[in-house]
Design a protein with these regions (language model features):
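Terminal low-complexity segments of carbohydrate-biosynthetic enzymes
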Residues: 114-190
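Conserved donor NDP-sugar-binding/catalytic core segment of glycosyltransferases
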Residues: 1-23
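Short, flexible, basic/aromatic active-site loop/helix in glycosyltransferases
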Residues: 15-47
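Alpha-helix capping and helix-loop boundary segments enriched in small/acidic/polar residues
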Residues: 48, 66-74, 103-107
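Catalytic cores of nucleotide-enabled group-transfer and carboxylate-activating enzymes in metabolic
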Residues: 1-2, 42-46, 78-81, 117
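Nucleotide-sugar-dependent glycosyltransferase catalytic core
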Residues: 90-92, 96-115
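Conserved nucleotide-sugar donor-binding
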Residues: 35-65
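Catalytic donor-sugar/metal-binding loop of nucleotide-sugar-dependent glycosyltransferases
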Residues: 67-71, 76-96
Length: 190
């Protein structure tokens, strides 16, 4: 996946799972115009998941279905549920996407934090909950210091919802009540 605004810069070529719950984009910000970058791009790494717009898979290998509609980060969760599969990337297959920073909204911030939280909450790693809390505090501070208080509020709402237990997730699959709550706090950042 490459950036629409800067078409030679790679956003990611799949993503890597780190310590079972953290993730980061592979080959992030690699410049496809540089010869050395192309050599780096050829080096295959174990990929954990890929974005919907450039990720193909055998439908018979699917064990758990994702939502039948796009929800921010559902490709990450889908990849997490199917991380045992051997994923390969292909040079020459690409798509250009709008920079995620331009897509930030209050609802996206809520959903993004929720998506990041799920692997940490179900991880058996000793410090997963602590690292999730550090990530949460950092994101809320960044939003607050940028005067994006509605984003910060949505992240706090998401954090609390994530800790509400299984019933919350089952009762809110359609996001209907969550959208109402998000709309109620969204006045300036639409």
């Amino acid at each position: 996946m490459l950036f629409e605004d800067n078409p030679a810069i790679i956003h990611e070529s799949g993503a890597i799972w780190h310590r079972d719950f953290l993730h980061y984009p592979d080959k992030h910000y690699l410049d496809a115009r540089e010869i050395d970058s192309l050599d780096t791009f050829d080096n295959e790494r174990k990929i954990g998941y890929g974005g919907w717009w450039f990720f193909a898979f055998n439908i018979n290998a699917i064990e758990y279905y994702s939502f039948p509609f796009f929800v921010r980060g559902d490709d990450l969760l889908f990849g997490y549920m199917h991380k045992k599969h051997n994923i390969v990337t292909l040079n020459g297959v690409a798509s250009w996407q709008m920079d995620f920073e331009r897509k930030i909204s209050v609802l996206n911030s809520y959903l993004n934090f929720r998506t990041v939280a799920v692997p940490a909450l179900i991880s058996k790693r000793k410090f997963a909950a602590l690292l999730l809390s550090v990530f949460f505090v950092r994101e809320v501070f960044l939003a607050s210091f940028s005067c994006r208080y509605e984003l910060a509020r949505a992240m706090i709402m998401s954090y609390n919802d994530c800790l509400s237990g299984r019933e919350f997730w089952e009762d809110n699959v359609d996001l209907l009540e969550i959208r109402k709550r998000i709309n109620a706090i969204t006045h300036n950042e639409k």
